Design a protein with these regions (language model features):
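Sec-dependent bacterial lipoprotein signal peptides
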Residues: 1-17
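Alpha-helix boundary/capping residues
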Residues: 11-14, 55, 72, 104, ...
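Intrinsically disordered, low-complexity segments enriched in polar/charged small residues
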Residues: 10, 37-38, 102, 111
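Surface-exposed, polar helix/loop patches in the mature regions of secreted/periplasmic/lumenal proteins
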Residues: 86-128
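Short S/T/G/P-rich N-terminal loop/turn motif that feeds into the first structured element of a domain
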Residues: 6-7, 18-84, 92-99, 125-128
């Protein structure tokens, strides 16, 4: 019987615990680094693949990268202006992004793409 009297208290504690956990799940602002590439017409499919794989390897080499995804253009609008590849890199701070920019792995990647792009656009933004 004593346990039954404690049941409402237990349920209240559980409800409050879940409510606290839910507030922790609110999305925090993150810094997105969007990189768009268009490849020079002389670049081979193997070279494009090498660049894709090299970019994919950066999150394993640079701990400041908190998220990464990429894909190729599939828009029917015809507004790509030669850009074919989009890479999205996520950081928790500008300090993390700045560390990524000067990291030796990123610098080596820059050398790999040198002379192989016909277009490049980079945009950074804070999520809202």
């Amino acid at each position: 019987m004593k346990n039954l009297k404690l049941l409402p208290l237990f349920l209240l504690i559980c409800a409050l615990s879940f409510a606290c956990c839910e507030t922790d799940k609110q999305p925090q602002k993150v810094l997105r680094h969007v990189v768009l590439f268009g490849f020079d017409s002389t670049v081979t499919a193997n070279q494009v693949k090498e660049i894709e794989e090299a970019f994919q390897a950066l999150p394993q080499q640079i701990e400041e990268i908190k998220g990464y995804e990429w894909g190729t253009d599939c828009s029917p609008e015809g507004l790509q202006k030669g850009l074919t590849h989009c890479f999205l890199v996520t950081f928790h701070s500008e300090k993390d992004r700045d560390a990524y920019l000067i990291h030796p792995a990123h610098q080596a990647f820059g050398k790999l793409i040198n002379g192989k792009l016909s277009a490049i656009t980079v945009v950074d933004y804070w999520t809202k």
